[in-house]
Amino acid sequence: MGEWKKVRIGEFLTERQGRYKPDDNAIATYKRLDKLDFSGTAHISEKPSKTDMIVVQPGDLVISGINVAKGAIAVYQGMEPVTATIHYSSYIFDDSAIDLNYFKYFVKSPAFIETLKKQVKGGIKTEIKPKVFLPLEILLPDLPTQKQIVKKISVNLKRVNKLAKEIETQKRYAKQLRRNILQDAIEGKLTADWRKEHPVQKGNPDYDAEALFELIQKERKVDKKRKTLPPILDAEKPFELPTGWKWVRLGEICNSITDGDHLPPPKQPSGIPFVVISDISSGKIHFRNKRFVSRDYFNKLPREKIPETGDILYTVTGSYGIPVPVNDFQFCVQRHIGIIKPVHLIKDFLFFSLMSPICKKQADGVAWGVAVKTIPIKELRNFMIPLPPLAEQKEIVRLIENMLLKVEQLEQQILRREEYINQLMKGILKGAFKER
């Protein structure tokens, strides 16, 4: 079918030259290409960057060096030039030699991955730069054949794309289901029937939040030098609580709320793990970075800066607003991570409260910064938390855990379906670009 020739990608793509500092006056009026998603959609913003920039002209082919094989490739359709970080590259293309839809399908195919493995020293890298991309040799058919292949792929992918859209809808549903469960929990809706059988008993912490709050104050180990938190005004309360509950400040029900050491610790090849924000952004602790500090450094840290079992980590910079429970092992954290030390008897309910939409909304309201937003620790202490009686907290936690387990099972089913669709997609592209 048609004539196939071995050509270098650089024969039909020409890199647009030019590299600029982020504060260069030459690009001061340009908006920024903030993201190129896997569907090839370009997202434009006015967010500044600290990274060197390139310029993308209208009609250029833009490629994400990090995610090109996942589909982050598009023709920029805007009317004005934009900037992009140097993790992107911009190309002028020869449309007499290449059909762009053909090329987009090719870079998502197993054939492209095999090309990288065979021709790039060291195999596939995390980022594909123009100096690696342009010299790659590929088999390219004539233009009419390219268009025929695109037509065939499009027909075969129509059903797959429909399934993929259904998967995205299911993902959004599962995510919203999580939010609804947590919001209903902290509003007392999950335990409305439970309260009918367990009415308020004044003075009993199990059935009266005021009594529980008093008990918490007795158990707290508080720095007396710390300023008293402001009272909660009626105008601040986002919703009405059930009878027997109480609005409290986060700082009123914790022994301490602080963050990691503000001075970068000396690195060690081994020792006590040093956790950074990327280690916990998934909601669990993963020692991906394998950074360590010395035992001597660790022992000199104030106790409130050492996470312990029952504590809650809370991301306060960048991907802020993510709570993470602490298990029984020793580590320390960077300053971008908050360390919440709740009074032990309410730790489980508090963790789910911090996951809830109302706490995320408060985080969004106080986060400040331009390129990277940060939640000040002072503002974190001021978060408003609904406090139910202790026995009701335990029932809420039980219900949440059971419901979220079902959501997790649903999410696993969605992931399996998504993997099946990905394999279908690869099979279609593999067949279209099989070696000749």
Predicted regions, residues:
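Non-catalytic DNA-recognition/assembly elements of restriction-modification systems
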Residues: M1-Y20, P135, L139, L143-K147, ...
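Low-complexity, Lys/Gly-biased intrinsically disordered segments
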Residues: G2-I44, S49-D52, G65, K70, ...
